[in-house]
């Protein structure tokens, strides 16, 4: 046998077993020691007496609120299938009231026999919002879907076509108005905000200063003032065109939200190192290609949490349209308990509206988190 041949490792069975046990012990993670009650208590409630006292008080208040809410909503509540008269003897929620008044809360004063029209419109807007937020379809299908949804909104809500009765704008209330103003204004605010952010970041004074003034003015005045301008002043400025209150409110909301979106995107643009511009330009990319392929994806990823917060705040602020004569869910909820026999059930109406807002804003938050994760992986 040659010298280069390796000789076999000859060990006794006892030595081989000991070696195996050593290797197994080295690779097996030891279990952490069990915490004593004192250690668990300090980790859960704090190290000092003050921290423990505060935590116990907060826990007690939380448990009390949970119990009171459960008692009101379930234990002492009147079931939805019971007669509304049974609510008089109940100490909890009156769900028959909500079952009876839900159509009024959702669709307001829209004619009763035609309430299928705002129902179809709301379903289309919700479907397109979900398809856009969660990217279920390509952008071409999104554009086609939004155009179709907006056409349906105008035709079904207003009527006059397909032998539909004409419904004046004053009777467009509730959920379809909230979805229309909330989703469309925020969707249109994204390109407006992007253009404003790019103009404000520009070195050309002709673009920089007008964009800066526009953004700071809109961010410096309250939303109510902007809505008053849109509903009462803007129609006078475009007197040649008949502009209804809901479309006037939509126009000013687009630019109002666009100003906040612009600042969110500008912060994302400023977080990108200048060296990335120079490196991409050195590879032969044009400025538009650098912006589209290198800078904007990173800027949007960086600004996604701020954009999500702006979207949620803007969607909730849509309720302020009630101050200019338009009626969203909060306003129609007040209509539902306007009669004397229902006035004691205002809480049920507002809980119903709050659940709707919570679900819709939760979807926006989920979509923002998913977009941020998707951009991070790409």
Task: Outline where the language-model segments fall.
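Transmembrane alpha-helices and adjacent helix-loop boundaries
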Residues: 3, 9-378
């Amino acid at each position: 046998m040659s010298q280069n041949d390796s000789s076999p490792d000859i060990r006794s069975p006892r030595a081989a077993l000991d070696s195996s046990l050593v290797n197994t012990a080295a690779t097996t993670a030891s279990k952490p020691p069990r915490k004593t009650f004192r250690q668990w208590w300090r980790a859960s409630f704090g190290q000092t007496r003050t921290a423990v006292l505060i935590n116990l008080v907060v826990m007690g208040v939380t448990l009390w609120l949970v119990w009171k809410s459960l008692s009101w909503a379930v234990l002492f509540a009147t079931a939805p299938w019971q007669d509304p008269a049974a609510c008089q003897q109940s100490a909890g929620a009156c769900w028959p009231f909500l079952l009876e008044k839900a159509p009024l809360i959702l669709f307001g004063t829209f004619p009763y026999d035609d309430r299928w029209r705002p129902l179809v419109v709301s379903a289309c807007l919700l479907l397109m919002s979900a398809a856009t937020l969660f990217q279920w379809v390509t952008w071409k299908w999104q554009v086609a879907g939004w155009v179709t949804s907006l056409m349906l909104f105008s035709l079904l809500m207003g009527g006059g076509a397909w032998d539909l009765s004409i419904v004046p704008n004053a009777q467009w209330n509730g959920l379809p108005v909230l979805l229309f103003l909330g989703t469309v204004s925020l969707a249109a605010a994204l390109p407006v905000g992007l253009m404003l952010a790019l103009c404000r970041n520009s070195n050309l004074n002709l673009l920089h200063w007008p964009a800066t003034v526009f953004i700071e003015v809109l961010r410096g005045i309250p939303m109510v003032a902007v809505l008053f301008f849109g509903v009462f002043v803007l129609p006078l400025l475009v007197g040649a065109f008949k502009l209804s209150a809901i479309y006037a409110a939509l126009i000013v909301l687009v630019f109002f939200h666009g100003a906040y979106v612009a600042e969110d995107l500008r912060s994302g643009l400023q977080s990108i190192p200048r060296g990335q511009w120079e490196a991409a330009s050195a590879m032969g990319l044009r400025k538009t290609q650098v912006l589209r392929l290198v800078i904007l994806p990173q800027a949007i990823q960086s600004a996604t949490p701020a954009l999500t917060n702006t979207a949620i705040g803007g969607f909730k602020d849509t309720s302020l349209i009630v101050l200019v004569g338009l009626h969203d869910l909060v306003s129609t909820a007040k209509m539902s308990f306007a009669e004397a026999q229902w006035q004691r059930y205002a809480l049920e109406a507002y809980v119903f509206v709050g659940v709707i807002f919570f679900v819709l804003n939760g979807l926006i938050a989920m979509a923002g988190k998913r977009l941020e994760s998707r951009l991070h992986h790409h």
